[in-house]
Each structure stands twice: as C-alpha cells, then as structure tokens.
Amino acid sequence: MSDTKVKVAVRVRPMNRRELELNTKCVVEMEGNQTVLHPPPSNTKQGERKPPKVFAFDYCFWSMDESNTTKYAGQEVVFKCLGEGILEKAFQGYNACIFAYGQTGSGKSFSMMGHAEQLGLIPRLCCALFKRISLEQNESQTFKVEVSYMEIYNEKVRDLLDPKGSRQSLKVREHKVLGPYVDGLSQLAVTSFEDIESLMSEGNKSRTVAATNMNEESSRSHAVFNIIITQTLYDLQSGNSGEKVSKVSLVDLAGSERVSKTGAAGERLKEGSNINKSLTTLGLVISSLADQAAGKGKSKFVPYRDSVLTWLLKDNLGGNSQTSMIATISPAADNYEETLSTLRYADRAKRIVNHAVVNEDPNAKVIRELREEVEKLREQLSQAEAMKAPELKEKLEESEKLIKELTVTWEEKLRKTEEIAQERQRQLESMGISLEMSGIKVGDDKCYLVNLNADPALNELLVYYLKDHTRVGADTSQDIQLFGIGIQPQHCEIDIASDGDVTLTPKENARSCVNGTLVCSTTQLWHGDRILWGNNHFFRINLPKRKRRDWLKDFEKETGPPEHDLDAASEASSEPDYNYEFAQMEVIMKTLNSNDPVQNVVQVLEKQYLEEKRSALEEQRLMYERELEQLRQQLSPDRQPQSSGPDRLAYSSQTAQQKVTQWAEERDELFRQSLAKLREQLVKANTLVREANFLAEEMSKLTDYQVTLQIPAANLSANRKRGAIVSEPAIQVRRKGKSTQVWTIEKLENKLIDMRDLYQEWKEKVPEAKRLYGKRGDPFYEAQENHNLIGVANVFLECLFCDVKLQYAVPIISQQGEVAGRLHVEVMRVTGAVPERVVEDDSSENSSESGSLEVVDSSGEIIHRVKKLTCRVKIKEATGLPLNLSNFVFCQYTFWDQCESTVAAPVVDPEVPSPQSKDAQYTVTFSHCKDYVVNVTEEFLEFISDGALAIEVWGHRCAGNGSSIWEVDSLHAKTRTLHDRWNEVTRRIEMWISILELNELGEYAAVELHQAKDVNTGGIFQLRQGHSRRVQVTVKPVQHSGTLPLMVEAILSVSIGCVTARSTKLQRGLDSYQRDDEDGDDMDSYQEEDLNCVRERWSDALIKRREYLDEQIKKVSNKTEKTEDDVEREAQLVEQWVGLTEERNAVLVPAPGSGIPGAPADWIPPPGMETHIPVLFLDLNADDLSANEQLVGPHASGVNSILPKEHGSQFFYLPIIKHSDDEVSATASWDSSVHDSVHLNRVTPQNERIYLIVKTTVQLSHPAAMELVLRKRIAANIYNKQSFTQSLKRRISLKNIFYSCGVTYEIVSNIPKATEEIEDRETLALLAARSENEGTSDGETYIEKYTRGVLQVENILSLERLRQAVTVKEALSTKARHIRRSLSTPNVHNVSSSRPDLSGFDEDDKGWPENQLDMSDYSSSYQDVACYGTLPRDSPRRNKEGCTSETPHALTVSPFKAFSPQPPKFFKPLMPVKEEHKKRIALEARPLLSQESMPPPQAHNPGCIVPSGSNGSSMPVEHNSKREKKIDSEEEENELEAINRKLISSQPYVPVEFADFSVYNASLENREWFSSKVDLSNSRVLEKEVSRSPTTSSITSGYFSHSASNATLSDMVVPSSDSSDQLAIQTKDADSTEHSTPSLVHDFRPSSNKELTEVEKGLVKDKIIVVPLKENSALAKGSPSSQSIPEKNSKSLCRTGSCSELDACPSKISQPARGFCPREVTVEHTTNILEDHSFTEFMGVSEGKDFDGLTDSSAGELSSRRSLPNKTGGKTVSDGLHHPSQLHSKLENDQVIIPEAAFWVLCCQ
C-alpha cells in the first residue's frame, strides 16, 4: 500500500482580450512552488491595505507570458510534471485521477484538452499511453484499453458514447465488490490513440447536441473520461497468467465561480436546485478528508454519497488512487475573489492522503466472489419464492449482468464498439452533422452551418452541410434535425440559387433571427451571418463563394464595431467577434425593440453619476475652503500654538485632499464594476425570461414572465458602499387568478432547470405517474411562496452617544424605494459610557485588541476606564404594511459584530383574524427585546456615528389574497395614502404670546387673558394703563404632528404694530385665521398666501399627471389588436385616472382631519389657542430639503404671508432682553407709547377691541438653515384700575385664569414627491426594464425616470438620519441636558475651557447656544457691558480702519458661548447655522446706540472701591460666589477687560427708520454715583449691576433699556429737549455747588424743539419719588435713626428727579447690595396701589402716624416691624412710567397710608 498526498498544481492563464482592453492589473505572482495573490487596489483603503496571500503547492505553472521563456510553462511542461507520473502509476497497477478545477474561462478545458496546435493533458496522456504500450507489449505481456465518457449534469449521468445515452439518464449503484459504478455505461474497446480521439470528438458532439436542445450550459456540467488499462502477464514456463487493472479518470469539473459567492450555493440548495450540488459536496469532501489527514477528525463523516460526482470519485479522493489536481486561475484583479476561492480550495485538497494499492489479478478473484454470491442469491430466492421477493430478484439480475460483462471476450468488446460507432455515425448523419474529425476543416467550395456554443470545447464542433434545398425542423424527415424549445416540425428552408445566392425562408410561427433581427419573409444570407432558430440554436453560415459586397462591408465598418474584420471572418471559420456571446447579445439588443437598451441604462447612470460626482466634489472643495477660512479666523496668531500651527493646517489640508482623491478613485472603480455587473445581469435576465415564456406558452401554463428592476436589499441599508448602482433586475411572475410573485435571477435559473426537464418529459409523453418533476411541484409558479422582503428599516445609532432613548417609527423602505410601512423601535444605552476618544495603551503590544479603553475629558484627564457598552434593541410593532405581504411578518437584523442574525418573531394571537380588505394596512405586534454587550473601539464608535442598524422586515403572502384578473396595482395595497405623503413633508409649531407687567412686588408678571366669544385670537389681554410691559414669545414644535425634521433654533427678532380698534357691535373682529361668520362683513383676516401656493403647485403636478394618463389611455385604446398586457395596462391607467380625480378633489376641498394642508380644523384647541391652523410653505428642494437661495432677511419664508390690515402698517422692533435656556423663548421690552396710538394710551371703551400684530422672526436649523417669519394677532383691553369689588371677585373666583394665547402653524417643506411621479414605482420599473424609449412629457425616458428615482435612496436615508437626529435632540432638550461631544473631533472653538472667547465665532454664531448660561455667572467681568445686543442683518461690520471686518462683531454673541458644550460628531448636521453654514446667513439683531458716550468700565474690576460706611472708608466689592465664577488669572482678567473696552467702543448701526426717535442713554445711570464723595451714612456696597444675560438691543423702538435695571424710556418722564437740558444743567449745578458730586442726570437727546408747557413743568417739579426697598435694606432691618439719610441728599435726589435707590446693608453682612431704578408715582398711582391691596394690613393707622410726620427714624422703625421678603429672586426690579399727560393730580392731603405689601420712602423737598 502506498500512502501519498494529492498532488496539486496551480496554473495561471494569460490575460484575455477583454482584460487587456480594460488594462486590468495582474494580481498573481509565482516564484518556484509558491503562488502569491495580491489584493486588488480597488478593494482596499489607504492605511489598511490587506497583505498578500501566499500559497505553496507541488507545482506552480506560470503561463502568463510566452515571451518569458525562463518562467513560461507550456502544455508540454504540464504533461511532464503531472501526466508522466500518472501514466507511470497506471502501468504499475494503481488507479489514477487528474481533475481540473477553476472558474469558467480560467483555462480548464485548455489544460485538459487543448487544441490542434497545443494538445492538452488528456490527448498527450493517451498518445503517450499507446506509445508505451507499443514499446512494452510482447508475448509475456499484453495490454487492453477501454474507455468510457460520461457527463454529470444536474445530478444526472449521461453516456456520451451511446447514441441513446444523451436522452436518458443512467443510475449510479454501489456494489460491495466493485464499489460505485454507473449502471449501463458504455465501455468501449480502443486499440489506438486515433480511436480515443474519434470517440472523444463524437462524445463532445453528442454533448453539444444535447446541451443545445435543452439549452443547458455545458460550463455547469462535469465531464468524466475514464481509461481502463488491463495488463495480462503470461508465465510461458508454467502457463499461469495474472492481470493488473488500473483506471485513469480524467475529470473536467464545472465552473467554480458560483461556489465562491458566499451563501449562494446554500440558497440555491434551499430552493431545490442541483446546479452546484456536486461542486459544493466536492468541497465538503475535500475539507473532511483534509481534516482527517490533519488529525482533527479521524471519525469525521465524509459525505461521498451527497452527490453523484463525489460518489463516483470516491476511490480517487482519499481512497485507492494516485490523484493529481490542477487548479486554473485568472491573473486579473477583477477575478480576485474567484481566484482566492480556487486557491483555498486547492490548498485544502493538497492535504488529502490517499491509500493506493496495486490492483493485481482482480478478475479471477472478482469472478469467483461474484459466482459465490450468485449461488447464494439463487438459494435465497428459491427459499423465498413463495414470498416473491422483488429485491432479491433485482439483486440477482444485477450480479448476473456483472458476471456477463466481466466474462465478455476482447473480441466481442471490439465488435460491440464498432457497432456503437456505426449507429452513432448514422444518427449524426441523419441530423445533418458532418462526420469529419474537426468540423471547421472542410472544403472551400462547400456551404455549411457551424454551431456556436458558450463552451469553447463545444463551440464550432457541429458542421451541417447545406444542399441546394435544405429543410430545417424537428421532424425526422427534415434534412437538419433540431430539437428543443421553439423548434417547429417544419421550421424553415434554406435555398442555394444557381448564381450562388443563399436565401432563408421561415415558416409561420417559427422563430428565425438573422443577425439578431426577427425575419418573417425570405431573407438573403451572406457569409458570416448569425442565425438563431427557436430559443437557443445559434449557427454561423459559411459561404466561401459568396463574400459580402464591398459596399455592405464598408457600411458595416462604419456602423458596426470597429474591431470587426469581415475579411478575416470570411477566411477564418473561428471569428472571435462572431462567437456565441456576440450572437446572443445581438439577438437580445434587437429583440427588445431598442438599438441598445442596456447601453441606455448605462449611459443614464453614467451621466447622473458624473453629475453627482462633480457636485459632490465641488461641495467638498467649498467645505474645505470654509473650514480653512474658519481656522484662519479663529486661530489668530497670538492664540495659535507657536510650534506647528501653519504646518498642521497645511498637513491637514493635504491629507484631506488625498482622502478626497482616494475616495473619488475608489468610487469610480466601484461604479465601473457595478455598471458592468448590471449590464451582465440585464442580458442574462432577458435571456432567461424569453426561454421561460417559450416553455410556459408551449405547455399552456398561463404564466407570464417579465423583467423588472428593484433595489438590492443590501443597498437599502445605510451601511452600504457608496457609489454602487442601487438597482438590479428581477423577474415578475404573473398567473391569471393568482397574485404576482417576484423572483430573483438565480431563482428563475433554478426553476428553468426543472422547467426543461418537465418540458422534456412532456415532449416524450412520459406518463404522469412516472414524471420525475410532477412530484416536486409546478416549477412555473410557486403555490407556496417563500418569504418576501417587505423592506429595510434603518435605525441610526447616534443616540448611544447620549444617555437618551430613541423611540421612533422607522420607515420601512421597499425594494422600489418607497415607504412600505413603519417599524416602531427603541434603542438605548443600558450601561457603560461612550468615550470622547479611545486611548490606546502604549505599553501593550496589541493595544487595539487589549480592550483598554479610557474616557477622556476635554482637559485630557482620564475619568475612568470602560471596556463594555450594553445596548438594548426593542422592536414593538410594524404598522402600515401592505396586506398582500402581511402573513407571518418577522424581522431579521445583525447587530455590529454578531456572527448570527437575530430574528424577531411576531406575537401571534389566533383569536384575531387577518383582515381581508384589499386596501387595508396591517399592523404586526412584536415583543422583541435584546441586550447586546459590545467592546467600545474606534471601529464601533465610527459605526454608531456613521452607520445604522439595518432591520429587514420579511413577510409571506396572505392565503387567498388573489385577484381574478391580471393585476399590478390591484394586489399591491396602497400603503401611501395622501395622509402618509403629506405627513412626511409637514410639521406643526406653536407660537405662544404672553404680556408681562410690573406687579406690586416689582416683578414682571403675566397679565390675564380673558376669553370672549367675539374674539377668536385666543383671548383679550388685560393691560393696565401706563404700565411698563414686556412681550414674551415662545415657539415650540408639536409632537407627533408630522415627520418633517423641523427644529427652531432661536428667536431673532420680535416686532409689534398694526394697532387697530374694532367695534364689537358694528365690525367683525380681526383674527389670525379664516372665519366663516355669516353675519360678518367682507373683512377676512385669514391669510392664504402660502396655502394658495401649495395648492397651485399640487394642482400643476396633478394636471401634468392627468395629461400623461390621457395620452397613455388614448394610445392604448387606439390599438386595433390588444394583447393581454394592453388590456391590463388600460385598466390600470383608468384606475389611476379615477384616483387622480379623487386627489384633485382633495386639493380643492380637503376633508376635516385628513392631514392635508388647508383642511378644516376638527380639534378642540387648548385654552388660548386659535382653532384654525395657517400654512407656511418653505418651498424646499424635495430631494434633500435644501433651499435654492438664502432664505434670510427680506427673502425669509413667511415674509409675504401678511395678515389683513397689515399691509402698510408700521411695526416697531422690540429689544430682546432675555432668551430662555430651556426652550426657544424670548422676552422683549415693549413701550406702547412708541406707537403714538390713542387706542393704547387711553382706557378701552366697553364695546371696543384693540388688535395688534406680533411678528416674530425665528431661525430654523432644520430642515434647512433659514429664517421664518411668524405672525400672531392679539387682542388687548386697556383699563385704568380695578375696583375693590372687581379685585375681590377675582381673588375668590374659581375660574381658571389664562395668561397666554397662541397660534399653531403647519409648516410645509415641499410638495410630496409621489404626487409628481407620473407612474407608480412598480409600473415604472417594468417600463424601464422593457427599455421603452418613448419619452414622457418632460422629455425623459422611463429608464431615466426610474434610475433618477432609484438613485434618490441615498437622499431618503440622509433625510431619515436627519429626522432621527432631530428626535434625539428633542429628547435631550426634554431632559434639559447639554449635548456633549462624544468623539475626538477637532474643536477649534473651545480653545479654552476656563474663559469666554469672543474671537472664535463667526457672524452666524449669533449667540444662540442650545443652553445659554446665565450672564450673572460672569458678571464680575461683564457688569459694565450694558448689554449684549444683536445687530441688524444688514449692518456693516467695520474695523478700526473703517473697512468691513472679517472677524465677528463683538456684540453679536453672548460672551459665554464658548462654554456651551460641543455636540457629538453626528450632531454636526444638526447645527447648520453654527457649524456648517457659517458666512451664509446673518441672524437678525438690533444694536446698542450711543455707546460712544458710555464711560470707561469701572465696576468690572474686583478691586473697584466705592464709598461705604459713615466714616467714609472704602471697601472692595465682594461678589456672590453662588452667582458668579471667579477669574482664574490676571491674564484672563486683562483679556476680559480688553473685550469690555472693545464692546463699549463699538459703533452701532442705526436703521434709517428709527433714526428720528429720542435716545435714552441708560449707560449713565448709576455710573457717576459710584464715584460720589458724599458721606452717605446708610450706604453700603452696591451690588453689581448686571444680574442676567440679557440681550437688550437697539433703539429700534425709540428708547433704550438699561442692562441692570431693565428700565425703559417709559420708566422716566421724558421732557423735551430745551427744558430737559435746562433742568439737567440746573440740577447739576445745584449738586455741584452743594456737594461737588456728579448728579444722576441722564443724557437725553432732544427729540424736538418743542418746549414744556408751564403745566408740564409744574408736574415735573411736583412729582413724587418713591423708592421700593428690599428685605435686607437698612429700613427693613431697623437701622438706627442716626444712620438715616441726610436731608440734603434727599433734596438733591428730589431735584434731579433721577435718583437711584439705595440698598444699604449692615456692614457685617458681606452680601452685596443691589441698585434699583427710581419709580415716580403720582397721587393717583399711589391710590391705585392702595386699592389693589385692600386686604393687607395698613401700617401707621393704629398708631395714629400721618404721612407728614413720618420721619426717617420712624420710617426705619416702621420698616423693622413690617418687613417683606424679597420676591425678586435677586434680580433688579423696575416699573413702568406714566405718560406725562397723566401727571396732573397733586397731593390732596398730607397723609398717605403705606400698605404692608410694599414699603415706600417719600423723598421730597
């Protein structure tokens, strides 16, 4: 026994012509016995290139370049290395085997067979065999050679040497003596090499005929050529003889490329196909034997019997045989995967160990054993004769047959071989086939047909000579007999005229194509014409005497491919351009009624791809330019690291450019490969469909097959490779009365095999009971269909960066690019944390695998280590599924690095029946919840940042859900209703407005909103006459109101105007919506500007669709002969037309609650909310929701959506003094006197309503960076005072009190895309696959429309990412958490985490952080900055030289924006205004005025000294540690001081329309008092002025608000210019002469030259200064009277009329005091206050103290007994000022009672 391993040789073929033309790179290299496979460049990325793979084999044959003689291995070298060794072993008596393995086209047949000039391994071995026999044969040694030739196709064995063998399959049996064998296989005796050559040639012809008749691809069949060598040894002396029998098996395996595709073989086997079962099993056998040889599984089962091939090769694989394997590979880079698979296959095969023994004298032993077995069987049979055992009888017949074969003499074998050969020749002659050795070597004067076949071994093998009159058909009487699909008994006739002309005349209903064109009449043939008969019989005609005419040659050279050489075609019979592929492609192109439909597809895709690529690269370039510009501006020279600032910029830009270039190259290569694949698939699909339709039609199966297009499931995932074509052909299967099925190309391939077998049995009229495939079901249509992919839902995992749960209804995107329902999922982080960046341990050798991960904060310190992260995935339910696929719906997904897919099964309730309505949408409930523990690596972080969890949703068709007619739409449930369409492009937002007034506690409180039936604005605001007011505006989205990713980022401006008075009796009220009052006048306040625009766009789209449908219906109706497809198409068009009419009605009269914009409201709004919902139309691009222009300023959305009575009205911009941190809300100061409207200055009459319009401009960050103008009409009632009765009633009333009114806006981004599509996606895919070139009304073909639509899947995924990111951000804002950055991306903004940085922000960073910090936290540094206002949109930014500055204006941003936390990487698209779209949109803002008059900053210095105490000593200002952050260093302090100086010295921009207003310079208030040298006995340290982060803006309303007191112009009496100047001068002089102290006079600007009247002057002089005191004031704490305010100070304060309150604390209390603005109150005002507080306890009454007698001492004593808690919350308090005209009353008595609710100090002269 000889134990030897299988010898394995690898041979690499030369590049073929296609690879040379494509300049494909060679990836295979051979050195000695090593083969090196390099990864192709297109499959690798820079920095992660795969290492080359090295394999070692017994032999490596380099056959790439014949010119390299030292390395080149030709056919002779291959034979010497493999053939000679095999032959030697055969002569020694061992069994031997050579099998060739490799993909189709890798050179297997060439290596095994070769051709005439270069013979292959088999001919050389046979030739050497007979040469050696002739040398060694003598008297004592004789040789006998027998051959058999069989083919294994689809697990069936056919005898290629038996004329009848090609029509019937043979059975494989296994005998305990002989082992596996083929029952009935011809074993013919040969005596010479010529006999073998002849038999192989005739066997190949039989193989070709059979394959052509059945349209089988020979590359999928295995050919086994067996040579049995029998040596008989005679001992001349003793007369004994012995035999050695060896069998040499030469196996040409099928193409292996299909096995290399992962999962493909398994899928096909599941579908019941046997195409590659033999190869798959062969791989398993080789693996099992290799494991056995390696000692891994000694008892491992080897599945020999799983396929016919491995069963027959059992001895050759791991048994009694010397085996060699030759693996053929391609050197091209585009065959890398197939080559790698082949090399791995061969690498495992070389480990197999065989146990070969010499088969010496087997015959005698075998015959003896067989005879003993026969006797034994006869005995058993006789004993069991009564039982009539059929098994024993069959076994007996089998053994007797074997004995008979073994005892046949050599002479009888030769005679039998001769008989079979003659019968085979007669059969070929009857079919018209030439019996020449080589079919192409015929006489020059003969006309003949030569076959074309995809297999080079079978191509041009059959030659049919033409007579003068040749008949072609399936009947036995025809000259050329053809069998197969589409061949009629009498198919056509070919006639040769006397002058040499050859013509072809087809018969009726007989398909004949010449050069790809279907011919129906007599057609002249020329030399080289390609002829197709039936479905798959391709021939080329050779007419040596009839060359093409010169003019025809020239014409073809001009129009045809340039490489066609017709002269060569006429002289050489094997013209490469006229091969099988050329002829097949030619037929497909012509049959599809198009010059080149596939080329159309390719051209459209290429065109769109190039446009996308160009725009993407341009956008990339602009983005890098913007980033570089930002870096230059933000990293100013004094702040850059001195080491490598510019170098880093240059390096990063260079690296970025390299990445962009590499990305473009990879994408181009991927796109090119995808185009080639799509072309191949389309050709293949059309070929298969044509054959399937032939078979179905001939067998009357009433089934129709059509090629359609669909998106591959892999491309519906957001993780797919960009650049690949997102479309593939699919097969739509339709049968009358049944539902439509969609098959893949592979599935149809598998079904076709069964169809052919069934067709063959049907043709041979095999009885139904014996039909093999009748038991396996109908291959034409699946009665029990497998599951179908409904769609893929992509869940983006950015929520794992934040500790927030993502609850979202993810759209399920179908393979037509439509939403086929929604999957409700939850994704959350259970445990663990996401690090900002992954830090690798340098000490570890393999840190990336060690799992040592650290969470690093922004300062670089390690917080804690984390290794694991637990994620939870929940699938709740699927809604809106198409009914026809809603039977047993399940989900399947793979999370991150999980090896196996997770399946989520539905919750099945047997009591709930399935809906049977055709248009119903189905809901499936799941209870799936699973936790995943993953290692947090850089790859995982990149995955959750950029990738998605792709959940596939599968379903089965509902039983009985069929239709009685052909259907496309009728079974396709309409899941996209109008509500669904509009829901994706709409979102509602609410705008709430409340008005605040000063209350008795000095706080701004919301005024009441009274409901009234005649007012539909939400209510009437009750405003006190003459009070200071504020307007608070809040904008927030409405949850579950649509899926448009809308996010309001900030309120930019608030303006108010359009004051209108309406009588409740005579006129109808003004509202913010449409009213259908029958008794009103024609006045209508509802704006329909945007709604009309929406309806107009919608109507235009419907009109286009209607015109298209009319045209199509007319076209189909005018056809005289309508096919079934035409009838179906007409019914479908009419159905669409009816649906279009319904949609048209929905445009004009939408049903209430239908979700269509403009639909009547059918809801009960909350109190204060308007009932009807106005529409705002953004008019964005439907593909990516981008704006065509910058929607800012005068171009902002909603600017022109004016309300009635608004046009021409005057609006006043209100200075915004505060933004909310928790929501999008802004508070603006409102002085109603600027309107100069009598309706706002007087008390409103009983039957009158005052209406105003509040106009708010908000900044949207999503769906696009833009500005949006919102309007709300409000109603107001001005009253003077509440009576005691009214006050009492209000306090004891149980009614709910409302304080705000609102309006809900419906924001529409664009018209739904589905509305604009002329055909539904499924029909469009069919029309595109048919390649109908007729254009639509817009000039686009169907294929262009379909590909354009399919390529937008990427846009769908991008929008979905945006929607989910908005959902995450809304969830975060609900939790009121800061969004932190979770990835280590460069953060040039956050240069320092310990100080504010104003220099690093652009113009668009207008100070709208997501969560603003309180200004008071840093008031020590910013208290002298009066306010951080915002600049107007069009204000110029100028530097010191006067030119426009590129750096952002200092006042445009809150100084603490640098402290707002940076968002994670995935939130970049969420902040287009702040991050991505800088320098594009200017936020609207208002400036500070008269800043040049502001004094230098003083109070910001912690060391600032103010007068304190009675002794005149100074003490430093101490700041409250709870409300501020201390400055860490002098450097920061100096920097902030410089910033303050810059802020104060900036020149503001004054809008022209506000230039005439008076200016109140609040910056002077409380400034000069700080430096006063007056000895104030009760004074204490003044508290800092700035206590919040207000954004007080400009003088736009005619006045200026102070930052600390929040007082406005209305807080003081504003005299006219002359008098005020005189008054100011007088008071200044008086103060300076008495105390030499700067007064508190405000610097008024003269508004006019009008002087005060005497009455007004008197009023000013008689006004009363009342100062509210705080809880911790001196009076409240009971300070001794000795520390009271000197009377001279009181006089001074009274004269100036501009005093600030003094909040004096005991010196032991370190809490800083707080300054207050003066409040001037008339007697009337005081009386109102007293009436409002009727329930309080009055002080001083019981003690009999009067107002005049209230001294300083008593006042202090009084305050010590009756003190009030401070309810201002540490904030400054101010109140409104009465109009000067109201100051007409004087004190009527000297005694005024002071209520407990507010203590007052009367300061008068």
Curated annotation (Swiss-Prot):
Residues 359-436, 602-775, 1100-1138, 1518-1547 form a coiled coil. Residues 1612-1621 have a biased composition (Low complexity). It comes from Homo sapiens (Human). Interacts with AP2B1. Interacts with ZFYVE26. Interacts with AP1G1 and AP1G2. One of its GO terms (biological process) is regulation of cytokinesis. SMART domains: KISc. It comes from the Eukaryota. This is Kinesin-like protein KIF13A. GO terms for cellular component: centrosome; cytoplasm; endosome membrane; Golgi membrane; kinesin complex; microtubule; midbody; trans-Golgi network membrane. Belongs to the TRAFAC class myosin-kinesin ATPase superfamily. Kinesin family. Residues 469-519 form the FHA domain. Widely expressed, with highest levels in heart, brain and skeletal muscle. GO terms for molecular function: ATP binding; ATP hydrolysis activity; microtubule binding; microtubule motor activity. Plus end-directed microtubule-dependent motor protein involved in intracellular transport and regulating various processes such as mannose-6-phosphate receptor (M6PR) transport to the plasma membrane, endosomal sorting during melanosome biogenesis and cytokinesis. Mediates the transport of M6PR-containing vesicles from trans-Golgi network to the plasma membrane via direct interaction with the AP-1 complex. Keywords: ATP-binding, Cell cycle, Cell division, Coiled coil, Cytoplasm, Cytoskeleton, Endosome, Golgi apparatus, Membrane, Microtubule, Motor protein, Nucleotide-binding, Phosphoprotein, Protein transport, Transport. Residues 1385-1396, 1751-1771 have a biased composition (Polar residues). ATP binds at residues 102-109. Residues 5-352 form the Kinesin motor domain. InterPro entries: FHA_dom (IPR000253), Kinesin-like (IPR022164), Kinesin-like_KIF1-typ (IPR022140), Kinesin_assoc (IPR032405), Kinesin_motor_CS (IPR019821), Kinesin_motor_dom (IPR001752), Kinesin_motor_dom_sf (IPR036961), P-loop_NTPase (IPR027417).
